[in-house]
């Protein structure tokens, strides 16, 4: 059985053995790991560790090629970021017309040539492919207002929030469709990320989530399913209160399972959602990996494997 076949079995809950993904270590850890294992890049790293799958993020493969070198989103108007609450260009906006006149990015400047080359290289090495634009619309909208302003404007200027969200999502939707038209048959799972939780709870209420997130969110899951792909959502934090909504919206698998966030322990998740979701992750990165012993890490991986069963990707 190839890794792609095994990964497909995991996603379809037909596997007899869990998978493994080495994840996305932070730069300092990555430098150390690459040196220790004598590898040069993420591709070689995954092969060395025997990863079942590989994440190919278009942003890391020169997808955006604006002739003037402009980024596709510039929420701070060229200013350097110093906090998540830093006011963005729409911090004081109260008029949808201002949003409509803003120079939103044109997906025609997306070039997936290098991304597709990496996809082909990954398949040739017998690894399943996770890909798609990161599509972190929730974060992007937040940046265009500043986090506090964003949450306030959901109540004071909801039409402005919805307009900004629509423009950002439209860019990602068109970019993803351009990629999917070229390579959907080679992408095993659409992987995108929006962190909806903090350590203790959701960042916004479930009611606000239903109004300002879900109508956009479901567009991405529907698009991926239209092209025959499963959907893996990355969402850090305590998101237990909206997991049923995410399942209803078409999420097939969930990452990273922030083990120490409230309500995200493996026992609860496996019992509550194990029939509906494939879990990717779950190994505690806040305490266990940085401070635990090798034996403790091994024991925890075995515990997670036993809880989630064979239809699980250790990461």
What are the residue ranges of the model-derived segments?
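Secretory-pathway glycan-assembly enzymes, especially type II membrane glycosyltransferases
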Residues: 55-57, 77, 116
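A contiguous, low-structure linker/loop signature
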Residues: 61-111, 125-128
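Intrinsically disordered, low-complexity regions
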Residues: 24, 36, 47, 51, ...
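Catalytic domains of carbohydrate-active enzymes, especially glycoside hydrolases
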Residues: 39-59, 182-183
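Short, solvent-exposed loop/edge-beta patches enriched in aromatic
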Residues: 15, 47-56, 66, 125
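Active-site loop segments of alpha/beta catalytic cores
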Residues: 1-40, 82-83, 101-315
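Residue-level detector of functionally special positions within alpha-helical transmembrane segments
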Residues: 2, 46, 50, 74-83, ...
């Amino acid at each position: 059985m190839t890794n792609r076949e095994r990964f497909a079995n995991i996603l379809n809950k037909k596997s007899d053995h869990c998978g493994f993904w080495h994840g996305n270590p932070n730069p300092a850890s990555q430098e150390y790991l690459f040196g220790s294992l004598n590898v040069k890049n993420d591709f070689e790293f995954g092969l060395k560790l025997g990863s079942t799958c590989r994440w190919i993020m278009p942003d890391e493969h020169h997808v955006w090629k604006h002739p003037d070198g402009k980024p596709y989103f510039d929420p701070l108007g060229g200013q350097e970021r110093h906090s998540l609450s830093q006011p963005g260009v729409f911090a004081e906006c109260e008029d949808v017309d201002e949003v409509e006149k803003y120079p939103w990015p044109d997906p025609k400047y997306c070039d997936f040539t290098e991304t597709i080359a990496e996809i082909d290289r990954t398949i040739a090495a017998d690894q399943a492919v996770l890909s798609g634009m990161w599509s972190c619309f929730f974060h992007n909208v937040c940046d265009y207002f500043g986090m506090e302003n964003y949450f306030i404007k959901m109540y004071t200027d909801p039409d402005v929030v919805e307009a900004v969200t629509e423009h950002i999502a439209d860019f990602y939707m068109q970019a993803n469709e351009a990629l999917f038209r070229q390579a959907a048959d080679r992408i095993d799972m659409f992987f995108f990320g929006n962190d909806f939780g903090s350590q203790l709870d959701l960042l916004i209420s479930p009611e606000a989530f239903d109004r300002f997130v879900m109508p956009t969110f479901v567009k991405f899951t529907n698009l991926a399913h239209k092209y025959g792909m499963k959907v893996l959502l990355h969402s850090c934090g305590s998101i237990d209160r909206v997991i049923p909504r995410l399942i209803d919206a078409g999420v097939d698998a969930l990452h990273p399972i922030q083990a120490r966030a409230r309500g995200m322990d493996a026992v609860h998740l496996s019992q509550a959602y194990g029939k509906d979701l494939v879990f990717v992750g779950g190994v505690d990165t806040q305490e266990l990996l940085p401070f635990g012993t090798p034996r403790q890490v091994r024991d925890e991986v075995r515990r997670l494997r036993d809880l989630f069963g064979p239809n699980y990707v250790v990461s």
